[in-house]
Amino acid sequence: GVTFGNNTFVGVGSSGNIVRSTDNGTSWDNATTDNSTANNLSGVTFGNNTFVGVGSSGNIVRSTDNGSSFSTVTSPTSNNLFKVAFGNNTFVAVGSSGNIVRSTDNGTSWENTTDSNSMLYVSWSEVSEVGSNSQIRVKSYDNSSWSTIDGDGNNGINLIGSRNATNPSMADNGTHLFAVWSEDDGAGNGLIRSAVYDNNSQAWDFLNSNYQALNNSTSNSANNPQLLYNNSSLYVIWSENNGTANQVRVRQFDNSSSWNLVDNIGANTTGINKDTSRNAINPKMMNFNSEIYAAWSESDGTASQIRVAKFDNSSSWTFVDGNSSTGINKATGKNATDPTMAVLSTKLYLSWSETNADNRTQIRVKSYDGSSWSFVDGDNATQGINKDYTQNASYPQLVTVTEGNIENSTDNGVSWNNATSYSSSSKLYAVWLEENGNSQVRVAEFDGTSTWSFKDGDSFDGLNINTAKITGKPSAVAYLNQLIVAWSEINSLGVPQIRVASSPF
């Protein structure tokens, strides 16, 4: 790397070599350095009359005499550092495994900063060792080891440990980890609970000071919540029975203690269903073109339809699925369930499970360019992207993995968020569960046009640890430029285990 400052060019390179020129690059001399380890240096910058270089094994050097001599400073990381920059009296360096370090004292001392993309979180529902109630458990992964962050006791993060809790969902805004789940009220109704993890106290705090559930009515049962962090706001979507039918409800967090309903469509104040007299289930949200899109499965009286609506970030939802009595199904007379969404380049992709004429469920995929929907699964009436279209496939997940993340900080480098980036190197993956005598976790990659290629070995079996054992529905996320897949799988003792795998598989 090379930089310029105070009429001086400074270049850094292999084996800790540092050179400088004070005559506009005509001649160069070696700078003196105490870099005894001779680590390679790859980045250098200038700010506030100081040159700072960074390199392998977390090596950091600085010069305050116009590049004549460099001294090694204590680094908070042993990960390789690639680049360094200066701004607002702060040096920031970035490196491998999502590592980001900063200095606010002219490069004298450095600290690790919070990078939301450097931690992986997994949550699930597990029966307690004491009693028979299911608890919400949470673990974090720092790219080397797993840590329990739910108290590690008999109870998880349930509000009431003696109540069953299921269907957790999490979201990270860069400074806090949020969780929602459905918890039994003791009478068989599901209550949507919400909590935030405090990194300092390492404890979970409930987002409502009076522990009020998020349900529109706590006398109604609600389930399948999902969180989405969008435009500095936190949203939650879920399905709630109003005594007549299941309604899709949405709330927005005010970043303090209140959740406000934002689920009106015109005169409809009971949710965002197309028909509020019909059941709507399994809702999901995704950010696309700076707006929130929601997709869910809703009955039309004959079959379940995939419905899609978008939110204007104010108060209004608009259907983008044709706004007719049917949705975007391949066959509107067949049941379609479990929608999932992701964004690749300039398009929104939506996948779901739909029954074909042979009563076999297929994984279907459509893309949306902001005005129209197109099938990208072969557009075949009989088969979707299943490994074997004669077998049932269900619970799809879509994930975009970008090779090279963009991080942004608005607090002088203290914390960092993963910015939305869909470069030409981004890849779209589909993950689902498919039968072959046993349930298998399957993974396929989209080529951006019309072809899906299997990335799970492309054989009879999928990712399962033991392909002869039953698995539960998978979950998938992007983490440090990799696809991470988690699922529940029965072990040899007949006990479900949470399994996690990373690409390449």
What positions do the PLM features span?
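Acidic carboxylate motifs that coordinate Ca2+ or other divalent cations, activating on Asp/Glu
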Residues: D23, D65, D105, D411
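Short coil-to-beta transitions that initiate beta-strands within beta-rich domains
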Residues: D34-T45, P76-A85
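Loop/turn residues immediately N-terminal
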Residues: G16-I18, G58-I60, G98-I100
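Extracellular, repeat-based ectodomains that mediate carbohydrate processing or recognition
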Residues: G1-G5, F9, G13, T33, ...
